[in-house]
């Protein structure tokens, strides 16, 4: 479910052919599969069937529904944000997910973005959630990890881990690994494999950003300098 599964530009991101990357069409990537095509090829190769829908409707009740969604391509400027809440361009997308969930059909979310965002609503409605980032031209790898072999043996296990912390709230000020108090939603290095058995409690769905009353930008004396400043990476 989701136009993002069929629009290759969404898996490529900004600075792809064009600056923002939004005006690209699938024909601009002649040797690249869309996420939908990669999933369809994988499922059919092991004897299954796939049906596409842009709103969650179906002809035959599915065993599982895969939702593909995320940010539109962006670069600097157009991609700047005032907060970290994910806003789907399809305003009805959450209702599609809620409807499928109410039918007791298992749901998988494949999320496309170039940065961590607050997706608590979507996480609560997902039996499995995979952060794809921007997979580019190699979306066959997505299908490789989310499906097992026909005999249910693992084909390719998940090995990706978060390279930075995933925020718990949009106004979370302390988020860097090693800083205290350190309490992200998903910590630096977090990631699951098929052998993990993890239950994530229902998350807060309040889309509220709290402006701080006061921010200390600088405190102390700037002159004279008593020490040499050395950049450390």
PLM region descriptions:
Residues 1-233:
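C-terminal non-catalytic regions of proteins with extracellular/luminal or membrane-system context
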């Amino acid at each position: 479910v989701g136009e993002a599964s069929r629009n290759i530009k969404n898996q490529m991101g900004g600075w792809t052919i064009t600056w923002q990357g939004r005006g690209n069409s699938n024909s601009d990537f002649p040797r690249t599969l869309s996420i939908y095509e990669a999933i369809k090829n994988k499922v059919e190769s092991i004897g299954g069937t796939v049906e596409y829908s842009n709103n969650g409707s179906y002809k035959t009740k599915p065993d599982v529904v895969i939702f593909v969604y995320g940010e539109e391509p962006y670069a600097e400027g157009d991609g700047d944000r005032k907060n970290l809440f994910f806003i789907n361009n399809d305003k009805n997308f959450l209702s599609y997910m809620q409807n499928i969930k109410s039918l007791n059909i298992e749901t998988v979310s494949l999320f496309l973005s170039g940065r961590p965002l607050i997706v608590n609503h979507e996480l609560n409605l997902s039996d499995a959630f995979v952060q794809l980032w921007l997979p580019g031209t190699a979306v066959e790898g997505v299908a490789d990890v989310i499906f097992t072999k026909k005999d249910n043996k693992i084909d390719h296990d998940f090995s990706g881990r978060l390279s930075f912390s995933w925020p718990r709230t949009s106004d979370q000020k302390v988020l860097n690994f090693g800083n205290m108090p350190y309490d992200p939603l998903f910590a630096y290095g977090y990631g699951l494999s098929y052998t993990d058995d993890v239950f994530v409690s229902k998350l807060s769905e309040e889309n509220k950003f709290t402006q701080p009353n006061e921010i200390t930008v600088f405190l102390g004396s700037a002159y004279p300098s008593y020490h040499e400043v050395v950049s450390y990476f």
